Amino acid sequence: MAVKTYQAGVTEYRQSYWQPDYAPLDTDLLACFKITPQPGVDREEAAVAVAAESSCGTWTTVWTDLLTDLDYYKGRAYRLEDVPGDDTCFYAFIAYPIDLFEEGSVVNVFTSLVGNVFGFKAVRALRLEDLRFPIAYVKTCGGPPNGIQVERDKLNKYGRLLLGCTIKPKLGLSAKNYGRACYEALRGGLDFTKDDENINSQPFMRWRDRFDFVMEAVQKAEQETGERKGHYLNVTAPTPEEMYKRAEHAKEIGAPIIMHDYLAGGLCANAGLANWCRNNGMLPHVHRAMHAVLDRNPHHGIHFRVLTKILRLSGGDHLHTGTVVGKLEGDRASTLGWIDLLRESFVPEDRSRGIFFDQDWGSMPGAFAVASGGIHVWHMPALVAIFGDDSVLQFGGGTLGHPWGNAAGAHANRVALEACVQARNEGRQIEKEGREILTAAAQHSPELKIAMETWKEIKFEFETMDKLAIANK
């Protein structure tokens, strides 16, 4: 074995981090970055700069390089691809040895892959498009505490999508009035009601008062309907200690499910709360507040499919995924891609849906996809077709905005859902025949008829900012 010697100075990154003949190992963590280099910086130079800075490189040679095996620990840029329709940027594929990352810590993965490298001067913009987590790493993560089947068993609800409602106005209600709004929606036919992500413990409604009034409403609705009900009690808090205090109280008063903002609250807090839920038999509903800051710019940030994978590893039984048809951003093909990444046990590479790598989840359970944001009864046929059964449809204004009140709005949504599920099961093309299906159901439901009349002109037709960059969509 040759003796390694130290030579001070600066070595070009490409001498160590560009390896186009590298065949990624099954145990490698693979990343796809979209890189927009600075003028005058060629593609290879930009790619290897990202590979070095996100693994074990630094700007100059250091003598401590001799104390380790950099050839093993380094990230390797192994392939570059054009971005269809955009010659200002390119895709760089980088392989990282699994030993660079702490087992079961998505926090540590993000510290390296979306850390200082995103401020690197060699690149004008940088976006993490996708990650392939090797099964050896997946098995070190906790994942969803319950999973889809366990949640259905807890709720005794099968064969259809679940229905929910975010209570509005999202800020300003007293705890007692808030509980009343929950009760009306639950007795009308919803499975869940939900705290808005903005609701924590403000002066107009402290968290303990809200929890107590809401659980009184849940239990009363259960007694009247004979169905299992729930409310997503938001335990997101200023500190982890306060978060666990709120979670413990939710458990004490019989709540089956709690809620956490996993990006605003932090990945470390989310993983800890998921472990607590696993140990205490609770369901964690996860909201994605803050995601658009990270994922909406098509050239810089983190794609939501990556945030979806991170959540599944970190732990959550529900995740908001967008609606395609509602008021929030979301391309249909991309949305279907990250919904599969959330729910399926194996998802193959599929560039038509923006999936750059095969992803094997092993035995890790999946989670419910949650559609929320500007949806109403007219969207029901499309939502059932797009999302499938293992989903939760959250109608906020589409429930509480009904002219006859919350219970009528909930009833209208339940009738519309059951009509669409029945039509689908009969083999009908529910997206094409949606108007006919809903109109027929409304003949027996005045609540649905009024809802259809109220929102018949409401559409959210805006161009998607983050479009799939594929050659043949």
Swiss-Prot record:
InterPro entries on file: RuBisCO (IPR033966), RuBisCo_large_chain_AS (IPR020878), RuBisCO_lsu_C (IPR000685), RuBisCO_lsu_C_sf (IPR036376), RuBisCO_lsu_fd_N (IPR017443), RuBisCO_lsu_N_sf (IPR036422), RuBisCO_lsuI (IPR020888)
Location of site Transition state stabilizer? Answer: 327
Which residues are modified to N6-carboxylysine? 194
Provide the residue positions that the database annotates as binding Mg(2+). 194, 196-197
Matching NCBIfam families, A to Z? PRK04208.1
Description of how the protein assembles with itself and partners: Heterohexadecamer of 8 large chains and 8 small chains.
Membership in a protein family: Belongs to the RuBisCO large chain family. Type I subfamily.
- What protein name applies here? Ribulose bisphosphate carboxylase large chain
Q: Which gene encodes it?
A: cbbL
